């Protein structure tokens, strides 16, 4: 599966304690238990030699974590499940936010900030710390060490580091993208060969500009004034959605495809995803009749969600492509597939985009219950209840 960077605008920084609403941004809540699978398009490709890993934050029984994650009396844990069996638990400390812990390469990594420093740990043991309070937007484990891309919590600027050592530092600007993207193990980072890519927004004499960075150098730049709406780096190629005077285009390595905006419609937001050897744009358009969603590839394929449905995430793995459908509060209702199939939800919400994964044609959803409803792991429409007081934060297949 390709890692990618999708530009949707600035991600809100994670806080050590989270009060109502539970997490920054729109919660992805759901309510209807007992959903069932209604399509027959699941691939039979086995996950040979691979295991399913879930991360979750667990609070003491009876504690109302959905109202306040700070005023807890008792231990809070980050749990790791392998194939539905709990295999590891570490104290959560200040890392309860889903952006502040991740499972990668057989290890559970956490980060948190003191009043002056940022600390990165593995299995609860400190790996390194560095001066400055940073929200980690990109995280990779490579042969040369742990790569982090941190947004300054106390102001503008960001830093690219390896094991805490600075490779690139900007005193202004912001990282775009982050750990909430489905299937993007590196968060705001994207790998291609020996290179690491990421996208940032920096001020310039021409106003703000989007920069595609390759390692510690600027690789490509787009001024905001030219209408750039979204940027993707995948497979070493740079793609973007761009507004022009009378059209909206998807540009891949300089080649433009006109996107299917209707007469009188404008683009509210857009998102880019790599799919097979193509690039897919999800567009939310606004017209006189209200909002409309559509998906279109650079190769010209177009997919139209059902009228009135809200699309929140795009899932792809090179074999299949689908999109999550949510209601007005962000409740997960179903996943629709590009071939016309449907997988119904079984109740629960996605705390993070990393709670949804498409791998080898199989759909995995780590769904957190609301108002006492059970937490559920759903694989290809079949769910398993997990009776703990807390929330899922990711699903990974390795």
Regions found by a protein language model. Give the residues of each.
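Structural motif
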Residues: 61-79, 115-120, 154-161, 204-212, ...
